[in-house]
Amino acid sequence: MDKHKVAIVIPAFNEEATIYNQVQSVKENGVVIVVNDASTDYTEKKALKAGAIVINHKNNKGYDGALNSGFFKANELGCEIIITFDADGQHDPSLIKNFIMLINNGSDVVIGVRSNFQRVSEHIFSWVSKFKWGIDDPLCGMKGYTSNVYKKLGHFSSYDSIGTELAIFSYNSGFKIAQIPLKVHDRIDDSRFGGRVSANVKILRAL
């Protein structure tokens, strides 16, 4: 597939330590869209230098709001596949090709599955999700979607679903979902969920 038909959406808030290398590592696979969620550091400058399209939020809209802006831009560019990718260095960029292959072979949504979780709340969320929807790791930030899923189901909700909503709605709507094991690296920077206590609260609230 023409790489201009693939968008890699990277939400970013104060990710100057990692964003340049993250963009560099994925841009061979498609158009890279960095959503700069009101960062106060040099995230925008470093993302642009690395070759990304940058969308700037004047006010922080959170992870779901950043995904909304990235998906809207990808759709505007005519991209047929949208891959979400975290900015903290955890995800293996070499796996993007596997996500694209699964979608080209008929899957509508591809969800990465981590081998272990750092928080009790993640275990609880995963257990509930697996029981209700058959999705092992809805909190994983590396997912792939066809543009058709986005066009039919619309944007992420205004409440903080931490990027889980579109995958779950896809299951409820009968879209074909594939899951793929991920190799996860240690975080280079802070977690997108925040500190330990706030992260657990945020994750459980999303249920």
Please state what every model-predicted region is.
Residues 100-103, 128, 132:
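Short, well-ordered alpha-helical segments in soluble proteins
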Residues 1-121, 145-155, 164-173, 177-184, ...:
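Structured catalytic core of nucleotide-sugar glycosyltransferases
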Residues 187-198:
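Short, flexible active-site recognition loops that position polar ligands and cofactors
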Residues 123-131, 197-207:
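Catalytic core of nucleotide-sugar-dependent glycosyltransferases
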Residues 143-144, 194:
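Short aromatic/basic micro-patch
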